């Protein structure tokens, strides 16, 4: 925040201590009350247009406001009229309030922009069918885009190089709660052998759009691919089991030299009593 802004607001709040008596003379005043000052900066197109607004609130009711577009304090209720008139008579307060557009808003924008509006995170793109794909059978193809920032993103579907628009559905950007977004764009399809579906993602964090393809295959090709994956995983499991057995077996042997010949001699591990 600008160096002069905090003392200025504090001074106004201290000045508001007279509010309890001036606003409630001749009325039943509450024993407890709350006075608040809330400052907001509104930016349009970066810092091209900046608006600084301070709201003064008494017991949840806004009664005086300073708006940099107006350039003065405005009473929003009858009870706020005395304070607005007094503060508008203070030329130093008016000038400091008007300067807050640069001293507070633009200053804080420059400090926060690198990790807020300037922050960019590239998306991860995955394409998969909703159900096991079969030729000539209606299905839904998902393009899942996750972990991107900012939330503005363009996702398109193509079939054999031609953009598909009529059968496209989207969840829209969903906030993850960690300053990233996710979305799923779905395409209704009836795959034919040789069809190539492409999800094209364009985002400000990318130097060029990212495309992920999904190709329609015959049932035989699909089952063959699944069988290949299963065989690979099974072979990997057997390999790991073999390595573990070999490592355990080697723990019970040492290698020594006898008469120039290398032999292996079993070594019994000590047993506890």
Swiss-Prot record:
Disulfide bonds join 41-105, 143-199. GO terms for molecular function: MHC class II protein complex binding; peptide antigen binding. Residues 1-26 form the signal peptide. One of its GO terms (cellular component) is lysosomal membrane. Residues 121-214 are annotated as: Beta-2. Coiled coil: none annotated. Residues 27-224 are extracellular. Residues 246-273 are cytoplasmic. Residues 27-120 are annotated as: Beta-1. Residues 215-224 are annotated as: Connecting peptide. The keyword Transport does not apply. It is a single-pass type I membrane protein. Glycans are attached at residue 45. InterPro entries: Ig-like_dom, Ig-like_dom_sf, Ig-like_fold, Ig/MHC_CS, Ig_C1-set, MHC/Immunoglobulin, MHC_I/II-like_Ag-recog, MHC_II_a/b_N. Residues 123-213 form the Ig-like C1-type domain. GO terms for biological process: adaptive immune response; antigen processing and presentation of exogenous peptide antigen via MHC class II; peptide antigen assembly with MHC class II protein complex; positive regulation of immune response; positive regulation of T cell activation. Keywords: Adaptive immunity, Disulfide bond, Endosome, Glycoprotein, Immunity, Lysosome, Membrane, MHC II, Signal, Transmembrane, Transmembrane helix. The chain crosses the membrane at residues 225-245. Pfam families: C1-set, MHC_II_beta. It is found in: Endosome membrane; Lysosome membrane. Belongs to the MHC class II family. PANTHER family: HLA CLASS II HISTOCOMPATIBILITY ANTIGEN, DO BETA CHAIN, MHC CLASS II-RELATED. Heterodimer of an alpha chain (DOA) and a beta chain (DOB). Forms a heterotetrameric complex with an HLA-DM molecule during intracellular transport in endosomal/lysosomal compartments in B-cells. Important modulator in the HLA class II restricted antigen presentation pathway by interaction with the HLA-DM molecule in B-cells. Modifies peptide exchange activity of HLA-DM. This is Patr class II histocompatibility antigen, DO beta chain. The gene is Patr-DOB.
């Amino acid at each position: 925040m600008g160096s002069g802004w905090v003392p200025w607001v504090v001074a106004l709040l201290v000045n508001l201590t007279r509010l309890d008596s001036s606003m409630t003379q001749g009325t039943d005043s509450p024993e407890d009350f709350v006075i608040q000052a809330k400052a907001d900066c509104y930016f349009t197109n970066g810092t091209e247009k900046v608006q600084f607004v301070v709201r003064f609130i008494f017991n949840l009711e806004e009664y005086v406001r300073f708006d940099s577009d107006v350039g003065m304090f405005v009473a929003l209720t009858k009870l706020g009229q005395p304070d607005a008139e007094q503060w508008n008579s203070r030329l130093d307060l008016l000038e400091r309030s008007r300067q807050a557009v640069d001293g507070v808003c633009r200053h804080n924008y420059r400090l926060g922009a690198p990790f807020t509006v300037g922050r960019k995170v590239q998306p991860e793109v995955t394409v998969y069918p909703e159900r096991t794909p079969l030729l000539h059978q209606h299905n839904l193809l998902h393009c899942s885009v996750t972990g991107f920032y900012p939330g503005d993103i363009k996702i398109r579907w193509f079939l054999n190089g031609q953009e598909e628009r009529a059968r496209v559905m989207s969840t829209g950007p969903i906030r993850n709660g960690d300053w990233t977004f996710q979305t799923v764009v779905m395409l209704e399809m009836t795959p034919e052998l040789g069809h190539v579906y492409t999800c094209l993602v364009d985002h400000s964090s990318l130097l060029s759009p990212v495309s992920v393809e999904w190709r329609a295959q015959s049932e035989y090709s699909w089952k063959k691919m699944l069988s290949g994956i299963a065989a690979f995983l099974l072979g990997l499991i057997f390999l790991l089991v073999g390595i573990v057995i070999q490592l355990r077996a080697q723990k019970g042997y040492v290698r020594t030299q006898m008469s120039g010949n290398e032999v292996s001699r079993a070594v019994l591990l000590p047993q506890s009593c």
